[in-house]
C-alpha cells in the first residue's frame, strides 16, 4: 500500500506554470476506504493509491491537500486546489458548479445502518447523513427527517447515541464499521443506487487537466490496474 506524507509532492513532470508546477489534489481524509489519514499523519486509501498512479501516468507533479467535505467544492472553485478526489459521486446538481472526469468507480450501493434489533421507518424516521452528500438529498426526497453532520464519523455517533434511527452512506464505508461494531450495528432495509459513480471534480475552466486525467483513468481501466485497486480496497463493482 502506497502512503505519502501530508502535502508530499509526487515525482513527475509539471503540467504548466498555470498550476504552479504542481497539481493540488483535494481530499477529505476522513472517508475510508476511499481516503483517510493514518496515525503517522499519512494519507491512505483507495483514492490516494489511485491519485498517485493517475499523476504518474499523466506525467504530472501532484501534492495532496486536506479539506473538510462541507467546503470542498467552494474551495476548489476558489483555487485552493485543482482537483477533488474524495469519494464524490457524479450528479447533475454538482455538474452545474464543476466538471467531472469519467467515473473511476461504478455507482456504489448506499445502505442504511441502525442499532441491531431496531425497527426503522425509512419514510418517516430520523435518518443521519453527511452534509452535502447524495445520500442527504435522497433522505429529503424520501420524506424522512434528515439530520446532517459535517463528518461521516458523526453520522455513526448519531445512531449510537439515539439522535438518529439510522444512517445512510456508501456501503463500502459502512461495511468495516458494521463488522467492527461487535454486533452493535447492523444493515437494515434495501440497498439504494444513487448517482453515476465517483469521479474527480475539476474546475470548468481546466478542461486540459480533465482531459489528462480522463486519459489516465481510461488507461487504468483498459489494463486492469483500476480493477486491481478496487479489489484491494473492497470498493465495489469492477469495470
Please give the residue ranges for each predicted region.
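Alpha-to-beta junction loops
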Residues: 59-61, 77-86, 160-169, 173, ...
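Extracytoplasmic small-molecule ligand-binding "clamshell" domains
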Residues: 21-88
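Periplasmic-binding protein-like
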Residues: 29, 106-111, 175, 179-218, ...
Amino acid at each position: 500500500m502506497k502512503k505519502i506524507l501530508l502535502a508530499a509532492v509526487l515525482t513527475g513532470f509539471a503540467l504548466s506554470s498555470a498550476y504552479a508546477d504542481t497539481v493540488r489534489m483535494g481530499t477529505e481524509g476522513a472517508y475510508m476506504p476511499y481516503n483517510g489519514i493514518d496515525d503517522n499523519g499519512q494519507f491512505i486509501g483507495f483514492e490516494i493509491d489511485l491519485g498517485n498512479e493517475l499523476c504518474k501516468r499523466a506525467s504530472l507533479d501532484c501534492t495532496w491537500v486536506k479539506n473538510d467535505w462541507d467546503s470542498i467544492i467552494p474551495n476548489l472553485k476558489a483555487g485552493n486546489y485543482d482537483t477533488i478526489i474524495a469519494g464524490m459521486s457524479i450528479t447533475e446538481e454538482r455538474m452545474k458548479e464543476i466538471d467531472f472526469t469519467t467515473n473511476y468507480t461504478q455507482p456504489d450501493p448506499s445502505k442504511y445502518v441502525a442499532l441491531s434489533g431496531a425497527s426503522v421507518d425509512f419514510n418517516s424516521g430520523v435518518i443521519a447523513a453527511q452534509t452535502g452528500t447524495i445520500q442527504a438529498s435522497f433522505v429529503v426526497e424520501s420524506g424522512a427527517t434528515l439530520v446532517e453532520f459535517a463528518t461521516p464519523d458523526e453520522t455513526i455517533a448519531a445512531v449510537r447515541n439515539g439522535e438518529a434511527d439510522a444512517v445512510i452512506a456508501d456501503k463500502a464505508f459502512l461495511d468495516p464499521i458494521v463488522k467492527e461494531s461487535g454486533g452493535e450495528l447492523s444493515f437494515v432495509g434495501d440497498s439504494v443506487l444513487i448517482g453515476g459513480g465517483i469521479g474527480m471534480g475539476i474546475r470548468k475552466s481546466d478542461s486540459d487537466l480533465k482531459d489528462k486525467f480522463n486519459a489516465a483513468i481510461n488507461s487504468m481501466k483498459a489494463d486492469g490496474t483500476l480493477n486491481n485497486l478496487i479489489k484491494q480496497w473492497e470498493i465495489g463493482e469492477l469495470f
